[in-house]
Amino acid sequence: MEIAQALILGIVQGLTEWLPISSSGHLVLLQIILLSRSSAAFIALVHAGTLLAVIVAFRRDVFNVIKSFLEGISELPKGSAFSSPERKLPLYILIGTVPVAVLGLALAKYVDEIFGSSKIVGVGLLITAALLYSTKWAGGERPLDLRRALIVGLAQSIAIFPGISRSGATISTALLSGLKREEAIRYSFLLSIPALTGFLILELIVSPAHEILNPEGLVGLLSSFITGLIAIKFLLSIIRRGRLHLFSYYCVIVGIAILSLL
């Protein structure tokens, strides 16, 4: 892989991981167009860049979640460990992560078939479009609870399939479940951290060290980190203005084009 290709793939990963248009789908398409399949190590590094982006963007929330979890653990003997909403959030994140972990392990041996199909990408983008468009009618003031945490976690699990946007699926589902807009945003982004961390660890385990420590990988990591931060800031402004559905038009156009041409 050349530096220019690494830069392009890193930028695409950074933008599409957080914009609700499916990073996996766009990476699959780019690899088809460039006739170059990225190594597991490179994929891991660009995901590391987007993971760092969300941790930096939500650093206060990440700190508070860790703090609440540790405080809850320390008060287990008292019987009031996870009674407050702040203390419950770490548990909701763990519970919401279970579906994607289970489905990911179940589909592990089918990775090549799933990620080698442009038709799956096209269908996935149309599903993403439907979810995003439906948010035109979403709205609520309900707090996060166990049921909604699990529902959003299930939505995250289907984003394993290329073409289905993780951020699009989780934020749309959270809004449709009646969650307050800010709570839907916060939970969706915090929920992504364990999933991305798990994926990153699995990819690094099977990656030779020499494939990780190279200029192309560093370019991919830095470009995905920088563009990831930009994408998160842009997406937050769109959601807060109630215009998440606008991304559905792009997903429909690209999804139909893929199914028609590839």
Curated annotation (Swiss-Prot):
Q: In the record, what terms sit under GO molecular function?
A: undecaprenyl-diphosphatase activity
Tell me where it mainly resides. membrane
Q: Name one GO cellular component term.
A: plasma membrane
Q: Where are the transmembrane segments?
A: 15-35, 38-58, 91-111, 114-134, 149-169, 189-209, 219-239, 242-262
* Disulfide cross-links: none
Organism the protein comes from: Korarchaeum cryptofilum (strain OPF8)
Q: Which reaction does it catalyse?
A: di-trans,octa-cis-undecaprenyl diphosphate + H2O = di-trans,octa-cis-undecaprenyl phosphate + phosphate + H(+)
Localization per Swiss-Prot or TrEMBL: Cell membrane
The record, for Pfam families, names: BacA
Tell me the name of the encoding gene. uppP
Q: Which InterPro entries match?
A: UppP
Q: What is its EC number?
A: 3.6.1.27
Q: Which GO terms describe its biological process?
A: peptidoglycan metabolic process
Q: Taxonomically, which superkingdom?
A: Archaea
Q: In UniProt terms, what function does this protein have?
A: Catalyzes the dephosphorylation of undecaprenyl diphosphate (UPP).
Q: Which family does it belong to?
A: Belongs to the UppP family.
Its protein name is: Undecaprenyl-diphosphatase
Keyword annotations: Cell membrane, Hydrolase, Membrane, Transmembrane, Transmembrane helix
Q: How does it sit in the membrane?
A: Multi-pass membrane protein
